[in-house]
Amino acid sequence: MAEITSAKAMARTVRVSPRKSRLVLDNIRGKSVADAIAILTFTPNKAAEIILKVLNSAVANAENNFGLDKANLVVSEAFANEGPTMKRFRPRAKGSASPINKRTAHITVAVAEK
């Protein structure tokens, strides 16, 4: 049986746009966990807070479920998929209304040993 060397965590239906999430995820992909945490801590972005939580969850999964060492972990996968869109309307002039799409994302972060 092969030894498990990776763990992942997901946050589903998060109220942040997947497009904006990807901008932050691109910064941490391939980095060590310590570097990724430092980057996310100082990124002034709503998505960064959520991604930091998911990253910490993935690290905890690796340590508790698979006995991996945090010092050797690298962010192997980081991606955001589109979640369900909440459709809303904004009232406009002359009794009309404009549609507003409030987008959500499914964020996945995977960590693996070097």
UniProtKB/Swiss-Prot annotation:
GO terms for molecular function: rRNA binding; structural constituent of ribosome. Changing A93E: Confers antibiotic resistance. InterPro entries: Ribosomal_uL22, Ribosomal_uL22_bac/chlpt-type, Ribosomal_uL22_bac/org-type, Ribosomal_uL22_CS, Ribosomal_uL22_sf. The keyword Ribosomal protein applies. One of its GO terms (biological process) is translation. Changing P99Q: In strain: 4ERY; confers antibiotic resistance. One of its GO terms (cellular component) is cytosolic large ribosomal subunit. Pfam families: Ribosomal_L22 (PF00237). CDD domains: Ribosomal_L22. This protein binds specifically to 23S rRNA; its binding is stimulated by other ribosomal proteins, e.g. L4, L17, and L20. It is important during the early stages of 50S assembly. It makes multiple contacts with different domains of the 23S rRNA in the assembled 50S subunit and ribosome. The globular domain of the protein is located near the polypeptide exit tunnel on the outside of the subunit, while an extended beta-hairpin is found that lines the wall of the exit tunnel in the center of the 70S ribosome. Part of the 50S ribosomal subunit. HAMAP family: Ribosomal_uL22_B. Belongs to the universal ribosomal protein uL22 family. This is Large ribosomal subunit protein uL22.
